[in-house]
Curated annotation (Swiss-Prot):
Cell division in keyword set: no
Alphabetized SUPFAM superfamilies for the sequence: Metallo-dependent phosphatases (SSF56300)
Lineage: Viruses, Varidnaviria, Bamfordvirae, Nucleocytoviricota, Megaviricetes
An example Gene Ontology molecular-function term: metal ion binding
Species per Swiss-Prot/TrEMBL record: Invertebrate iridescent virus 6
Name this polypeptide is given: Putative phosphoesterase 244L
Alphabetical UniProt keywords: Hydrolase, Metal-binding
Family according to the record: Belongs to the metallophosphoesterase superfamily. IIV-6 244L family.
Keyword Manganese: no
Record: residues binding a divalent metal cation 1: D45, H203
EC code(s) of this entry: 3.1.-.-
Coiled coil ranges: none
Residues that coordinate or bind a divalent metal cation 2: D45, N80
The protein's enzyme class: hydrolase
């Protein structure tokens, strides 16, 4: 029986202040899109600024999608940052409507069922917290309980957003199908059947640094059988945090890569900071 290979790309957030990193991301991402990939799923938040579009970032995003769709069928979940605001529910008020005219391109702004080989997948765009099951039931009550996997861009109960743990996100019964979701930028698994691969590009200090593309290999169409997950880390600039004692700052050696951003957090007593200032070490 043929397996099914899906490449998942999480939250690229094309912005005017990360264009150089985006160029490197596109180059390396396309190298991973080999001919044996059945479909590519872009997990939402391709752009960043909601209803305010920046031409350079928009053109980069459109060009990227155009290149991906020429390699394999491409499914794009509409994320909250792709919408005008975070309160939209299965809405067409986003920037990707014109892309629906392209072949091999599927814009997911409404709950969808996708059949590939012997496998069945659900796809849901971002919906406000608490409305995920409602969105699934839009098509037919509880059809989604019999899929191999659901792709989403959703906040689930218990996921971590920096120091905050979600108490408003959707609760997802442990007997429900596996969900692979965008929206949360740090890789995590709040429960067995929910997995956040994290954003393919690090967007803020404190987010996990070893995120990447996620290759999902489905070998068994039997419901409840989880796929093999292979992380493909890209060699693109990171946002690195270095913790150092103030007494050791003068001997700190940095070897930053091109476009890498580094935050240095110095720790010490009030007295040690006063002594540091007197030494005028820069």
């Amino acid at each position: 029986m043929d397996n099914c290979k899906i490449l998942f790309i999480g939250d690229p957030h094309f912005k005017v202040n990360n264009i150089e990193i985006i160029d490197e991301f596109i180059h390396q991402c396309l190298e991973q899109l080999t001919s044996d990939i059945d479909i590519c799923v872009i997990g939402g938040d391709i752009l960043h600024t909601h209803e305010r579009l920046h031409t350079t970032a928009l053109n980069k995003a459109i060009n990227f999608i155009d290149q991906v769709r020429k390699i394999c069928p491409t499914y794009i979940l509409v994320g909250n940052h792709d919408y005008e605001n975070n309160q939209q529910f299965l809405s067409k008020r986003h920037w990707m409507n014109a892309l629906k005219e392209w072949t091999n391109t599927f814009i997911i702004d409404y709950t969808s069922i996708i059949k590939i080989k012997n496998f069945t997948f659900g796809m849901v765009p971002y919906v406000p917290p608490g409305r995920f099951v409602e969105a699934l039931n839009i098509i037919d009550n509880e059809w989604w309980k019999n899929v191999n996997c659901i792709f989403a861009h959703q906040e689930f109960y218990g996921c971590k957003m920096g120091a905050i743990e979600s108490t408003e996100g959707d609760k997802w019964d442990h007997s429900f199908p596996l969900v692979i979701s965008g929206h949360i930028h740090s890789e995590q698994r709040p429960q067995k059947n929910i997995f956040y691969p994290g954003s393919v590009i690090q967007h803020a200090f404190g987010e996990s640094e070893d995120n990447g593309l996620l290759l999902l290999i489905f070998n068994d169409p039997e419901i409840g059988e989880y796929p093999l997950m292979v992380k493909k880390i890209l060699d693109i600039p990171k946002m690195r945090t270095i913790n150092v004692k103030i007494s050791d700052f003068s001997t700190l050696v940095l070897d930053p890569k091109k476009n890498e951003r580094i935050k240095i957090i110095c720790k010490g007593s009030v007295e040690s900071f006063k002594a540091f200032k007197k030494n005028k070490v820069v």
